[in-house]
Amino acid sequence: MSQGLQLLFLGCACSLAPAMAMREVTVACSETADLPCTAPWDPQLSYAVSWAKVSESGTESVELPESKQNSSFEAPRRRAYSLTIQNTTICSSGTYRCALQELGGQRNLSGTVVLKVTGCPKEATESTFRKYRAEAVLLFSLVVFYLTLIIFTCKFARLQSIFPDISKPGTEQAFLPVTSPSKHLGPVTLPKTETV
């Protein structure tokens, strides 16, 4: 076999290696997920392990700091270099990467695991907002309509002098009590009339 063909096969094998190292774990909502580290490792050597959740933008955010043991993320000793996520939610779904660093610092190995959490209810706030969005828009529209109606009614009434502007000089206040001077109100007697 020629050297060029061997390099081609080697290149294909190297490009397929990350795809073969990726494993998928499916777990039901609120259950415990055990993610095994798929990096190839030598049982004769000791490694320091770190786990990270790969975000959609491609950057990694560390989910398991070495100092936090009370977190819902823990690395138990049941299975070497595995990550246990307790009480999984839909937010737990995603791609996780384990990195093994040889204690001598000579080799770094990594593997990828995809976690799928099924059976979780959708976000309550999001579905509630979607459910009542039309009613909220209608209520807001009615409030705006009634405020506009009140404002235009007051302006129209002022223009028609129903409610005169008393701050302007020369205008009288409406609804003042009207009294007539020196008119005595007493019993009224009607003259007698004859019927024919």
From Swiss-Prot:
Record topological domains on the Cytoplasmic side: 155-196
Cellular localization per UniProt: Membrane
Glycosylation sites: N70, N87, N108
Alphabetical keyword list: Disulfide bond, Glycoprotein, Immunoglobulin domain, Membrane, Signal, Transmembrane, Transmembrane helix
Residue ranges annotated for the Ig-like V-type domain, each copy included: 22-110
S-S bonds: C37-C98
A biological process from GO: positive regulation of CD4-positive, alpha-beta T cell differentiation
UniProt cross-references to PROSITE patterns, sorted A to Z: IG_LIKE (PS50835)
Transmembrane segments: 134-154
PANTHER family: CD83 ANTIGEN (PTHR15193:SF1)
Subunit structure as annotated in this protein's UniProt entry: Monomer. Homodimer. Homotrimer. Interacts with MARCHF1; this interaction antagonizes MARCHF1-mediated MHC II and CD86 down-regulation.
Stated name of the protein: CD83 antigen
